[in-house]
Amino acid sequence: MTMSDLRRRGLLIILSSPSGAGKSTLARRLMAWDETLSFSVSATTRQARPGEEDGVHYRFLPEAEFKSLVSSGQMLEHAHVFGNFYGSPMAPVSQAIEAGHDVLFDIDWQGAQQIRNSDLGKHTLSIFILPPSIPELKRRLESRAQDSDDVIEKRMRKSWDEISRWDAYDYVLVNDDLSVTEERLKTIITAERLRREQQPALQTHVRALQTEFEDLEQ
C-alpha cells in the first residue's frame, strides 16, 4: 500500500484574527494552493442581499428551521448577531471531511470553541493570526479605504477582545510578512493532515504489514 492509497479524513481548519491581520488574504492563498480546500457555507436567518445566492454565499433559512437544527445538534456553531442567527451546519462539513476534503472556517473565538466541543472537535485545527503591532493593525485598516473613521475605531476596540483569546488556539502566527506566514500555514496544514486520527486506513495498513511479517516467518 502506498501513501496515496491511505485516504485521509479532512480537517476543520479554523482561521481567526482581528480585522486587518491578513486572515482573508491568507485564506485565499491557501485555497489557491490547494483547490480541494473550501470555505464552510454558513446558514443565516437574515434576508439575502442583492447578488447573494442560496448555497453559495449563505444558506438562507427560516428562523424556525434554523432553531430546529440547533436544538437537534445539527449546527457545529451558531450565534445571534444584530437580530439574525448565523451558524455552520454539520452535515455538509461531515460529508466533506469523510471524503478527505478540508473545510475552512472564518469565525471568532466563540465559534471556534463551539466547534472544538462538537462531535467533530477531534478533527479541528485552529490557527490564530496576530498583527505585528497595534499601530500596524490600524494602518492596515486605514489603507483599505473601505471604512469610515468611526467603523475603523469600532474595529480597533473589538480587536483587543479577539487578540486576548489567542491562547485558546492550537497555533498562533504573527503576520509581519505575508509570504512567510503563508508558508508557515501550509507547513502546519501539511503536518496536521498526517495526524494518526486523520488517517483511518492506517490500521488496515498495519494489519497487512503484520500478515506479511507473519508470512515471512512461516
UniProtKB/Swiss-Prot annotation:
Q: Where does ATP bind?
A: S17, P18, S19, G20, A21, G22, K23, S24
Enzyme Commission number(s) from the entry: 2.7.4.8
Record gene name: gmk
Q: What is this protein called?
A: Guanylate kinase
Q: Give the protein's biological function.
A: Essential for recycling GMP and indirectly, cGMP.
Taxonomy of origin reads: Bacteria, Pseudomonadati, Pseudomonadota, Alphaproteobacteria, Rhodobacterales
Enumerate the catalysed reactions.
Answer: GMP + ATP = GDP + ADP
GO CC terms on record? cytosol
Q: Where is the Guanylate kinase-like domain?
A: 10-190
